[in-house]
């Protein structure tokens, strides 16, 4: 080991330099100052002295006490006056009593050698640790020196080897040249093979071998010295552990020896020590968990979509929601756990909490799925049938026209003879296939007609020749122009006597729908749905328009389309009518429709037959979705059902966040609207319909019935039969149950009868709207109307001591009654409103004075009546209000 100075060794051990010098002198090492060197032998001598001193101190402690406690007791007396007195009147000597007082003192004296021994023990431990560290440093130094020597040896061997090879090559070259010069001197040299002299190579190899043996001997010598030094230190450490006394009292057993590695239990123990204790300690250490408390904050990458709730953001940062809400309060933002935050606010909060925000697009996965679908549809486009939407006003014969084309009787089966949902059919003709979409004509089905115009190729506008252009006809024209879809006008009912096709052309031309005969681009076809007249011309016009448009679609790959209608079938579950726009829809495909997903269990065409696949422009009913998609949602086929589920759930979450944000924005408005709610009556409705489109149309139409005095609220709207939950909701909210083409199940009917819930069934949307309108009208408060019943003109003014000014009047119109209110008019301007105080004729009080009769009128609390004024008498009448 390297020699240290006394001062450096004192710093290593951790004791003052003066104490180390005194301990060295006590150990017999004298004449050492702070700057003098201290060898390993001196350190071992000092350690041995300190150990002996500690052992001797402990033996002295066993023979003599380490501390002495002295107790001293001092007893004295104290006289105190006795309590109580002598006789009642006698004054005798004062009595006293004696009290013993004992004072105890206790002092403890500690032997100074015990303190010194304790300090010496600490010095020994520090010295042992210092020696162990020195040994480790020496081993590390020896290892490094051995590695460096080995590296130098290898480098030297490599250099000598290269030098020997070069020398041997030079000698061989010289010998070959000498041999070539003497080749012609003798014939034996010509016949013999020229062999180089190996003497130089042999000498070089012997030299190299001698050098290698010398280096190997030096390396072994260094390793033996290091090993001997290490063994000597280990023997000294084992000797230290053997001479150390056993611990007394309740000291820990299995004390670690200096020679043992870290973490290994000692062999020697107390009475219960030994292998069992050692193995127990080993097992306990193995059972310890490896968790370590973080020394610095954990920074997470938090993915933040466009909108996120407070609870979800706290979960992503692995903090409690209360902690995040407190942080938001510090930033001046008040929010609840379910409130949605925008992306910028969430980024600021994440940065404030010490994490790293990562902005993600909420529609990234959705775009990936749609891109995969579009790539799967790449290919050559094939001609496809045109999609034709039939639009027009109600009762203009749209469904009857389609029935005649399809040779079916759909209109007769419609409730009320009107269409109330989109019907989709495809028809085989001589010139090709055509897909027809029949839309409702009633004003309540605006959304259905708009959807029909968006997904169609051609619009057939049906106009009755006897009615002309009606409101829904104008609306259909607007939808077609907004969707930039070509139109074909079918002038229906031309077989009626009062039919006027020219008037239809005139009215449509005012809406910029110009016939071809007038120089426009719109075909006008005269048809009769009942007689079947003009149907071939209509089909020919449709197919001609389709040929001009050159319609085409990819017929292979994943299908995509749009949802026309959805309903809840009791035996089939959620079913959706979809129109395939491209690709091939097959049974077993994974489907994504808006916020719903599923696997296609069955495909059914409009005739009720099951089919295995459906191509472009073919409408089919799909079974197997997880729920009811909304009409108008896009339909795509995806390769992975898991991705479809993730996209559907993400869309639902986006809708939920949007709804929560709208609710939060409406809270401030509600604060002001709550003051008016007591004045406004509310009609609550629960609507259940057979299909999604009908429920949507009925909900919108009923909500539009609201007025300033009565508000109509559709608190729930759904598809399917009326169940118990609908009845319970109507009970809780005091609502009216409306079933549109659906009925209540047995449990719901029983609950309705028990609780007397207002339940109504409708099959025609007219009846539903009309009856709700009548119910609302009955809740309206009647209006008060004023009817003028008489008019009197002031001819003169008299003064009365009792009544003040009395007007002498002539009744010019109607009659003046005493109990009715009056108005005083001057120059046809009302200057006073009040009531009559007296009405007299010839000094007699009367209740009524008719036209053409003079009378005296006293106006209550009004004396400024002048000649020429008019007194108007009127009555208030309650009138029933209607919507």
UniProtKB/Swiss-Prot annotation:
Protein name: Translation initiation factor IF-2
Region (G2) residue spans: 417-421
Gene Ontology CC annotations of this record: cytosol
Subcellular location: Cytoplasm
Species of the source: Alkalilimnicola ehrlichii (strain ATCC BAA-1101 / DSM 17681 / MLHE-1)
Region ranges (Disordered): 52-102, 115-297
Primary role: One of the essential components for the initiation of protein synthesis. Protects formylmethionyl-tRNA from spontaneous hydrolysis and promotes its binding to the 30S ribosomal subunits. Also involved in the hydrolysis of GTP during the formation of the 70S ribosomal complex.
Superkingdom classification of source: Bacteria
UniProt GO molecular function: GTP binding; GTPase activity; translation initiation factor activity
Region (G1): 392-399
Broad class of where this protein is predominantly found: cytoplasm
Keyword Cell cycle: no
Annotated PROSITE patterns: G_TR_2 (PS51722), IF2 (PS01176)
Keywords tagged on the record: Cytoplasm, GTP-binding, Initiation factor, Nucleotide-binding, Protein biosynthesis
Segments for region (G3): 438-441
Region G5, residue ranges: 528-530
Residues bound to GTP: 392-399, 438-442, 492-495
Family that this chain belongs to: Belongs to the TRAFAC class translation factor GTPase superfamily. Classic translation factor GTPase family. IF-2 subfamily.
Domain (tr-type G): residue spans on this chain: 383-550
Pfam families attached to this UniProt entry: EF-G_D2 (PF22042), GTP_EFTU (PF00009), IF-2 (PF11987), IF2_assoc (PF08364), IF2_N (PF04760)
Protein encoded by which gene: infB
Comp. bias intervals (Low complexity): 239-248, 276-285
InterPro entries, A to Z: DNA-bd_dom_put_sf, EF-G-like_DII, IF2_assoc_dom_bac, IF2_II, IF2_N, P-loop_NTPase, Small_GTP-bd, T_Tr_GTP-bd_dom
Chain residue ranges for the region called G4: 492-495
């Amino acid at each position: 080991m390297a020699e240290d100075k006394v001062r450096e060794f004192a710093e290593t051990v951790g004791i003052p330099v003066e104490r180390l010098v005194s301990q060295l002198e006590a150990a017999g090492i004298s004449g050492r100052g702070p700057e003098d060197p201290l060898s390993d032998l001196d350190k071992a001598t000092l350690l041995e002295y300190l150990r002996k001193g500690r052992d001797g101190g402990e033996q002295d402690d066993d023979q003599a006490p380490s501390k002495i406690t002295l107790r001293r007791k001092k007893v004295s007396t104290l006289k105190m006056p006795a309590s109580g007195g002598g006789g009642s009147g006698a004054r005798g000597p004062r009595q006293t009593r004696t009290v013993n007082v004992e004072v105890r003192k206790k002092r403890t004296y500690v032997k100074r050698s015990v303190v010194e021994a304790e300090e010496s023990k600490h010095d020994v431990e520090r010295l042992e640790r210092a020696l162990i560290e020195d040994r480790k440093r020496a081993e590390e130094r020896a290892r490094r020196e051995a590695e460096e020597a080995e590296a130098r040896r290898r480098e030297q061997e490599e250099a000598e080897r290269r030098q020997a090879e070069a020398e041997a090559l030079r000698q061989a070259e010289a010998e070959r040249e000498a041999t070539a010069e003497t080749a012609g001197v003798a014939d034996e040299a010509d016949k013999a093979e020229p062999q180089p002299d190996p003497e130089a190579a042999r000498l070089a190899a012997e030299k190299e071998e001698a050098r290698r043996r010398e280096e190997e001997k030096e390396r072994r010598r260094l390793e033996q010295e290091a090993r001997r030094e290490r063994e000597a230190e280990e023997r000294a450490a084992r000797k230290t552990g053997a001479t150390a006394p056993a611990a007394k009292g309740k000291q820990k057993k299995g004390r670690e020896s200096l020679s043992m590695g870290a973490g290994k239990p000692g062999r020697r123990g107390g009475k219960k020590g030994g292998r069992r204790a050692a193995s127990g300690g080993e097992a306990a250490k193995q059972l310890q968990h490896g968790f370590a408390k973080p020394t610095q904050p954990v920074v997470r990458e938090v993915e933040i979509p466009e909108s996120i709730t407070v609870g979800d953001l706290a979960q992503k940062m692995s903090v409690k929601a209360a902690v995040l809400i407190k942080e938001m309060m510090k930033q001046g933002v008040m929010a609840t756990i379910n409130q949605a935050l925008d992306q910028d606010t969430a980024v600021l909060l994440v940065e404030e909490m010490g994490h790293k925000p990562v902005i993600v697009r909420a529609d990234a996965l959705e775009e990936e799925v749609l891109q995969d679908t579009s790539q799967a549809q790449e290919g050559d486009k094939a001609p496809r049938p045109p999609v034709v939407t039939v639009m027009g006003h109600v009762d203009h014969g749209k469904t009857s026209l389609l029935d005649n084309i399809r040779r079916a009787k759909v209109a007769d089966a419609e409730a009320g003879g009107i269409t109330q949902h989109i019907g989709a059919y495809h028809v085989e003709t001589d010139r090709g296939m055509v897909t027809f979409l029949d839309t409702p004509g009633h004003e309540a089905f605006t959304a259905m007609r708009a959807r029909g115009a968006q997904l169609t190729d051609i619009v057939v506008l049906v106009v009755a020749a006897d009615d002309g252009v009606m409101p829904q006809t104008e609306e259909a024209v607007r939808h077609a122009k907004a969707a930039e879809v070509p139109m074909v006008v079918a002038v229906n009912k031309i077989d009626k006597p009062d039919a006027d096709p020219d008037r239809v052309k005139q009215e449509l031309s005012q809406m910029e729908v110009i016939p071809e005969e007038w120089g426009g681009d719109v075909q006008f076809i005269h048809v009769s749905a009942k007689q079947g007249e003009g149907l071939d011309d209509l089909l020919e016009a449709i197919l001609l328009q389709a040929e001009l448009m050159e319609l085409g679609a990819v017929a292979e790959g994943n299908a995509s389309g749009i949802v026309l209608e959805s309903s809840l079938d009791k035996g089939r579950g959620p079913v959706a009518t979809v129109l395939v726009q491209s690709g091939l829809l097959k049974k077993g495909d994974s489907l994504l429709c808006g916020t719903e997903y599923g696997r296609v269990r069955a495909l059914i065409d409009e005739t009720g037959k099951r089919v295995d696949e459906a191509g472009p422009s073919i409408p089919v009913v799909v079974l197997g979705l997880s729920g009811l998609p909304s009409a108008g949602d896009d339909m795509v086929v995806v390769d992975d059902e898991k991705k479809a589920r993730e996209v559907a759930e993400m869309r639902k979450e986006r809708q939920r966040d949007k709804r929560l944000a709208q609710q939060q924005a409406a809270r401030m408005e509600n604060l002001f609207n709550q003051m008016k709610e007591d004045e406004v009556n509310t009609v609550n409705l629960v609507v259940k319909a057979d299909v999604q489109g009908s429920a949507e149309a009925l909900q919108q139409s009923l909500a539009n019935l609201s007025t300033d005095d009565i508000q109509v609220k559709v608190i729930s709207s759904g598809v399917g039969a009326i169940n118990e939950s609908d009845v319970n909701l109507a009970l809780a909210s005091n609502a009216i149950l409306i079933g549109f083409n659906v009925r209540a199940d047995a449990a719901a009917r029983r609950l309705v009868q028990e609780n007397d819930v207002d339940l109504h069934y409708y099959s025609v949307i007219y009846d539903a709207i009309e009856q709700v309108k009548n119910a609302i009208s009955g809740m309206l408060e009647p209006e008060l109307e004023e009817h003028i019943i008489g008019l009197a003109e002031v001819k003169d003014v008299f003064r009365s001591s009792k009544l003040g000014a009395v007007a002498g009047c002539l009744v010019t119109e109607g009659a003046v009654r005493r109990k009715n209110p009056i108005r005083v008019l001057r120059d046809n301007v009302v200057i006073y409103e009040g009531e009559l105080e007296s009405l007299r004729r010839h000094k007699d009080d009367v209740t009524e004075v008719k036209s053409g009769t003079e009378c005296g009128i006293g106006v209550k609390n009004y004396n400024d009546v002048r000649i020429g004024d008019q007194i108007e008498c009127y009555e208030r009448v309650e009138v029933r209000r209607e919507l």
